[in-house]
């Protein structure tokens, strides 16, 4: 089409931004679904299916629970003096010694797990007047009867069981964990056969605490040929404190102490295999990468892990608003500005220029505005990770049956925390996405304003992101506009002259329409005047008569 001014004496310059055929939908504060050119998934929703043994030291419990390894169950002797960052308990773990219970099982398990060691120091307890090293067929060590290796079962010597009173000071500079127990015979006959007295008792004291346990004699369900039970207790002795043990029967005595350590070791129930690999974050499902700020694999974690949320997906915008390129783009064919649509195929930048002049058409990216936008977006993912990643482990919570209400409260608190973090994650990502879209739009507007200030009166804003340049602007001229060296004074006279000529032609073309409309209006007015005059003349002559009735 041969339009006025669309010749070699003018040029068209359009500004635009990158676009893709199929963008990604993200959520912002103002819009639940807005399309962007690129986005990054923030929720880790799958695990590797295996537990990595690096950088954390993983100890596979195999068929032993941590408490069985602590007590010295014969089939758990391989764990003596072991250390770990994470002790992995398996679902097929079992006890293979005298049946026992731990009244405060969860606390003992947690205490030992966090210590990260089963280092045991034997001490010289003196038990006078009793028989030591009792055993049971329920706890065989090889072909012989045995017992827990870390405990000493004391029974009568001959026909006597004297009152025992033993003290053991802690002269070291660390806490000591003593494990001891009380035997509950199944019958009164068994009680007197083992301990002489019809009713024994055990008292274990320190300066800070005291525990007195009276045996509960009675038959219980048979386990490994035994209807009696042993209750396991524990006492922590601080540096400078003293352990005091008093008993007149039924005592399962300690052989020494476990050296307590402070740290961030833990325990986890999992059947995932352990493999040689590297991962900072471990869940019961297996290790997961920690390069995302959120995960919905498992609530239980160990290591530096993403925060657990309920959402399956949260996408962080890492590109600009996507406006796919239209197939038809107006009078200039391939030339259209950012207000109409984006440009597909821009591989060297996010923002750029397209031009049409006497030498043809061309395209080039604007690296300055592109880099400015990228610099602001690049740090977003790392900042979100820093705000949300756990630098500690979320341990399993266990409570005994009598602590059911505490367990319910704990579950409510944990669920509330997850709800809050899920909501916070949603808002945080929406805010970041809103900021990304706003800043990328802002860079586009900055580039447009910078170009407009350069061209001044030498060009006219066409309203679609393009400028009509009213002077001859070859490729060198176009390049000067792009790199900011354009001198509008050089082209000012030519641009003004061409602008007046083009506007003049447009003005003359417009006058024809005005003249036609004015002529038509005057003709209609004159016709009405003549017709009205004829009617009045006829009325005066009597040729026309008008009757007006009310």
UniProtKB/Swiss-Prot annotation:
Pfam families membership: Hemagglutinin
Domain of life from the UniProt record: Viruses
GO molecular function, one term: host cell surface receptor binding
A single BP term in Gene Ontology: fusion of virus membrane with host plasma membrane
Cytoplasmic compartment spans: 536-550
Signal peptide from the UniProt entry: none
Residues under site feature: Cleavage: 329-330
Compartment annotation: Virion membrane; Host apical cell membrane
Lipid group attachment sites (S-palmitoyl cysteine): 539, 546, 549
Keywords, in A-Z order: Clathrin- and caveolin-independent endocytosis of virus by host, Clathrin-mediated endocytosis of virus by host, Disulfide bond, Fusion of virus membrane with host endosomal membrane, Fusion of virus membrane with host membrane, Glycoprotein, Hemagglutinin, Host cell membrane, Host membrane, Host-virus interaction, Lipoprotein, Membrane, Palmitate, Transmembrane, Transmembrane helix, Viral attachment to host cell, Viral envelope protein, Viral penetration into host cytoplasm, Virion, Virus endocytosis by host, Virus entry into host cell
UniProt keyword annotation of Iron present: no
Transmembrane segments: 515-535
Post-translational modification: Palmitoylated.
Disulfide-bond pairs as recorded: 14-466, 52-277, 64-76, 97-139, 281-305, 473-477
Record-level GO cellular component terms: host cell plasma membrane; membrane; viral envelope; virion membrane
Membrane topology: Single-pass type I membrane protein
Extracellular side: 1-514
Keyword hit for Oxidoreductase: no
Residues carrying sugar: 22, 38, 165, 285, 483
Record-linked InterPro entries: Capsid_hemagglutn, Hemagglutn_HA1_a/b_dom_sf, Hemagglutn_influenz_A, Hemagglutn_influenz_A/B
Misc: Major glycoprotein, comprises over 80% of the envelope proteins present in virus particle.
Its job: Binds to sialic acid-containing receptors on the cell surface, bringing about the attachment of the virus particle to the cell. This attachment induces virion internalization either through clathrin-dependent endocytosis or through clathrin- and caveolin-independent pathway. Plays a major role in the determination of host range restriction and virulence. Class I viral fusion protein. Responsible for penetration of the virus into the cell cytoplasm by mediating the fusion of the membrane of the endocytosed virus particle with the endosomal membrane.
Protein family per UniProt: Belongs to the influenza viruses hemagglutinin family.
Assembly description: Homotrimer of disulfide-linked HA1-HA2.
Name recorded for this polypeptide: Hemagglutinin
Originating organism: Influenza A virus (strain A/Duck/Hokkaido/9/1985 H3N8)
Gene name of the encoded protein: HA
